[in-house]
């Protein structure tokens, strides 16, 4: 019995991955179970509800699981067969089983018969397929029982490899794959549970990964950022790292003399990082251009303080930030904080429940001076001018009160509205606008509606709460327009150089701050 158990232990080292049906698990124990004959494998299932216990049977602990019902004992014979990456790739891309044809025997037969034209049926077809196999640039063997490399040196053109959801369970296996593929730059290891490498293993294996530029470790069971940083010592030249769906929770500052020296992209989607203070710990990643922190439950964006006319010396290269599906409760404050980032050009964010995309777009554009795209929508010069002008008018009274309240009052205003001093430089002092905003407003306003093509002008008294869509209907009727609905914009009577598009048909003139004697242009 001891010999049999030793053989099982040799075949299933602790940490080995197994698959039964659609269920994946990790070997946590190999040996006897009291009261039961033979050798057993103690399995911790990826699905924490799949098992029957937590590693304790009849009061004795054999192994430990993360969930109360994550463990089971199974017979070794229940575990299905494994495969090499070589065999899995050939089967998927050639539909060819090498055991059916012994190519060396065929070549011997050709030589012995001295028949240069000797041909075995199907051999030419296999040769053509083999040629295509060698030229493959991308290979995916996801959802296969791969747990070893095999012979891969023929794949000299391979740049992208997907071995997600396989049975690869340690970095020695990954290294034996990578070292045979000199052109490999993109590696997807998602949904594999890999044993943490030792320091000596990292020293030994690191040369095998020097060509790697992009690696995806989605749902690989990481729960400690320190383990990520330790493992990252394997990839000295990594540019893009995916850690989606690993429950990290907390982060720590990175030692850039050792890891992430060239990192451009980091994906922390759904990693349970609920506090933005944790995100700022990565601010010393000076080469980072893209950061994805969507679906993390972040409610507030808070960055270190800096003067309103300055930018922070963190995330100095960050151009793209993904905040989608985080319950950020104060959009205006969040955008004001993000203006502190020196290079932010692209932002993705879900509108607040009490907001909509157009309102969010306007706030973001006016509050983040460097922003060029939001949710993939490009910010045009006209849209920026309109958004900035709305903010310029909205806080005109607050600005005037702050300037009259002394240095501290003005500093506090600029802290809460970082871009406002820039808007004053751009559009002038809002002092002459303040009396208009303070005065008791009539429900009706007189506006001049001018057709730009014909020059015809229509003086009209309209309700402040009239929608753009209703006004478009009146304009079409008055100017006898047919065909496409005309585009409208307005010019502030006191600042005729500012042209603001009325680009949301559902909004009112009051929303756009159209005032008495302003001009509406029909385009």
Curated annotation (Swiss-Prot):
Organism domain of life: Eukaryota
InterPro entries recorded: CAP-Gly_dom_sf, CAP-Gly_domain, LRR_dom_sf, SDS22/Internalin_LRR, Ubiquitin-like_domsf, Ubl_TBCE
Gene3D superfamilies assigned to the protein according to its UniProt record, in alphabetical order: CAP Gly-rich-like domain, Phosphatidylinositol 3-kinase Catalytic Subunit, Chain A, domain 1, Ribonuclease Inhibitor
Compartments it resides in: Cytoplasm
PANTHER family registered for this protein in UniProt: LEUCINE-RICH REPEAT AND IQ DOMAIN-CONTAINING PROTEIN 1-RELATED (PTHR46652), LEUCINE-RICH REPEAT-CONTAINING PROTEIN 9 (PTHR46652:SF3)
Family assignment from sequence similarity: Belongs to the TBCE family.
Record function comment: Tubulin-folding protein which is required for the development of the neuronal microtubule network. Essential for the development and function of neuromuscular synapses. Likely to promote microtubule formation by acting in the negative regulation of the microtubule-severing protein spas.
Name of this chain's protein: Tubulin-specific chaperone E
Organism: Drosophila melanogaster
């Amino acid at each position: 019995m001891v010999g049999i158990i030793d053989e099982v232990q040799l075949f299933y080292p602790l940490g080995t991955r197994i698959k039964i049906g659609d269920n994946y698990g990790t070997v946590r124990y190999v040996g006897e179970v009291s009261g039961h004959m033979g050798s057993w494998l103690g399995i911790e299932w990826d699905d924490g509800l799949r098992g029957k216990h937590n590693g304790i049977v009849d009061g004795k602990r054999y192994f430990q699981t993360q969930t109360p019902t994550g463990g089971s004992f199974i017979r070794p014979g229940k575990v299905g067969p494994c495969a090499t990456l070589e065999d899995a790739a050939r089967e998927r891309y050639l539909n060819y089983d090498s055991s059916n044809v012994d190519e060396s025997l065929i070549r011997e037969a050709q030589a012995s018969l001295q028949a240069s034209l000797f041909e075995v049926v199907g051999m030419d077809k296999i040769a053509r397929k083999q040629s295509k196999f060698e030229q493959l640039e991308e290979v995916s063997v996801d959802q296969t029982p791969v747990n070893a490399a095999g012979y891969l040196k023929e794949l000299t053109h391979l740049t992208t490899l997907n071995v997600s959801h396989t049975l690869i369970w340690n970095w020695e296996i990954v290294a034996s794959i990578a070292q045979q593929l000199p052109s490999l730059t993109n590696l997807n290891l998602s949904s594999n549970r890999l044993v943490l490498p030792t320091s000596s293993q990292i020293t030994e294996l690191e040369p095998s990964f020097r060509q790697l530029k992009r690696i995806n470790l989605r749902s690989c069971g990481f729960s400690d950022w320190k383990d990520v940083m330790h493992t990252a010592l394997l990839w000295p030249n990594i540019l893009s790292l995916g850690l989606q769906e690993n429950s990290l929770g907390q982060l720590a500052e990175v030692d850039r003399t050792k890891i992430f020296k060239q990192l451009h992209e980091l994906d922390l989607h759904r990693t349970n990082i609920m506090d933005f203070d944790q995100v700022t710990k990565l601010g010393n990643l000076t080469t980072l251009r893209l950061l994805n922190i969507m679906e993390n439950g972040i409610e507030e964006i808070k960055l270190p303080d800096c003067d309103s006319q300055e930018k922070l010396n963190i995330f100095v290269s960050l151009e793209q930030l993904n905040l989608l599906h985080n319950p950020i409760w104060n959009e205006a404050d969040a955008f004001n904080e993000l203006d502190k980032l020196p290079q932010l050009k692209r932002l993705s964010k879900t509108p607040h429940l009490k907001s909509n995309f157009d309102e969010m777009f306007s706030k973001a554009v006016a509050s983040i001076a460097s922003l060029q795209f939001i949710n993939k929508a490009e910010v045009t010069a006209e849209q920026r001018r309109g958004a900035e002008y709305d903010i310029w008018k909205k806080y005109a009274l607050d600005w005037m009160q702050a300037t009259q309240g002394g240095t501290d009052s003005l500093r506090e205003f600029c802290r809460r509205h970082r871009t406002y001093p820039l808007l004053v430089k751009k559009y002038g002092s809002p002092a002459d606008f303040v009396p208009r905003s303070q005065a008791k407003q009539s429900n009706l306003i007189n506006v001049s509606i001018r057709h730009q093509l014909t020059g015809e002008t229509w003086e009209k008294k309209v309700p402040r709460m009239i929608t753009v869509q209703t006004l478009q209907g009146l304009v079409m009727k008055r100017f006898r327009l047919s065909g496409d609905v005309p585009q409208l914009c307005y010019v502030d009577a006191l600042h005729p150089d500012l042209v603001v598009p009325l680009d949301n048909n559902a909004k009112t003139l009051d929303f756009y701050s159209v005032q008495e004697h302003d001009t509406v242009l029909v385009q």
